[in-house]
């Protein structure tokens, strides 16, 4: 463990210093795009490994430490979440507010209440005063990620900082999967989707990484807009029919505000058909809300399926056998081991 921490700390230091010496307007140059696995029927050797929030099961989510860890593992892509600050900086953070389960103030104390600390009400300089490098003991997050290693001193990074680190620290070119966080149900919590998506696309173009990036969102308005302003960037349609978030709203009167004007009931409840109508080719459902039949039908429509976010070996294996094209996971190390072992067994005479 000490050896791993030493290697990671040195890699992070090199990456951060390398990025810090470049002016903000100067791009880090990266290698060429690689093609993620594709095909109508997924096999072990063609499953895309996408690190969720970097590698949140192993290092603090959405931090440079997590993305460096994902690079070390050798993922095909990293997934991250973006929001806009009060001074219009694109930062990498999952929640609309600072999360008390992972956030400490500059005096080292855990946040007690996030209600007055919305990301869009804080400047980048203010956000950089918070430490997000450790899980709060006994918190739900701590129970969710028992293997996560603390990395004290980690700050909320900007999208540009993550891009720079990936270009400098990954041994192979990987894809960048950016989830844009906006909500139609509480519009004051974020700027309009057009504003955020345009800023993200602008950064991708300036950093010369748009050819190996994908845009994800539960708010399909972002995806439809990206398809108009940057059709070369693939869009990935997220879906969840849960209690705290339901962007599909099957059986409810009228179109879901999340689905860019589409009503799922007009498509007999078929999310792949709705995605096709929106102009999409990639679907990312919650892994517990997809069946082998749905995956097969999505493939018949030319839509690839990338599930999120199973972390147990049994769930990963089951999903691979169901035919998914890729898995977004907090434990890319486990997924890589499963694929390596299974591919080796399949290659035996």
Regions found by a protein language model. Give the residues of each.
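N-terminal secretory signal peptides that target proteins for export/translocation
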Residues: 1-7
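Phosphate-group recognition and catalysis centered on beta-loop-alpha active-site segments
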Residues: 7-13, 17, 21-349
């Amino acid at each position: 463990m000490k050896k791993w921490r030493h290697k990671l700390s040195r890699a992070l230091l090199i990456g951060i210093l390398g990025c810090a010496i470049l002016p903000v307007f100067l791009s880090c140059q990266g290698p060429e795009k690689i093609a993620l696995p594709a095909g109508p029927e997924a096999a072990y050797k063609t499953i895309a490994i996408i690190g969720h929030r970097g590698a949140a099961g192993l290092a603090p989510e959405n931090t440079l430490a997590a993305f460096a860890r994902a690079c070390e593992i050798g993922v095909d892509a990293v997934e991250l979440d973006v929001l806009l600050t009060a001074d219009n900086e694109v930062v990498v953070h999952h929640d609309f507010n600072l999360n008390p389960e992972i956030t400490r103030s500059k005096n080292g104390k855990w946040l007690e209440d996030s209600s007055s600390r919305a990301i869009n009400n804080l400047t980048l300089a203010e956000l950089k005063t918070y430490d997000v490098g450790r899980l709060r003991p006994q918190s739900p997050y701590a129970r969710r990620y028992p293997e996560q290693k603390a990395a004290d001193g980690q700050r909320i990074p900007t999208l540009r900082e993550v891009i720079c680190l990936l270009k400098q620290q990954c041994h192979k070119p990987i894809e960048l999967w950016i989830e844009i966080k906006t909500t139609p149900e509480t519009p004051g919590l974020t700027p309009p989707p057009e504003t955020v998506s345009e800023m993200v696309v602008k950064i991708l173009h300036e950093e010369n990484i748009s050819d190996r990036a994908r845009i994800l969102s539960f708010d399909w308005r972002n995806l439809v807009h990206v398809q108009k302003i940057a059709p070369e960037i693939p869009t990935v349609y997220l879906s969840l029919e849960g209690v705290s978030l339901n962007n599909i709203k099957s059986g409810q009167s009228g179109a879901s505000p999340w689905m860019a004007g589409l009503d799922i009931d007009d498509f007999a409840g078929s999310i792949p058909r709705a995605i096709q109508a929106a102009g999409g080719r990639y679907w990312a459902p919650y892994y517990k809300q997809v069946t082998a039949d749905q995956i097969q039908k999505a493939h018949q429509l030319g839509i690839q399926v990338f599930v999120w976010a199973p972390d147990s070996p049994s769930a990963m294996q089951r999903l691979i056998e169901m035919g998914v094209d890729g898995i977004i996971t907090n434990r890319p190390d486990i997924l890589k081991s499963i694929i390596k072992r299974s591919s080796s067994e399949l290659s035996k005479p």
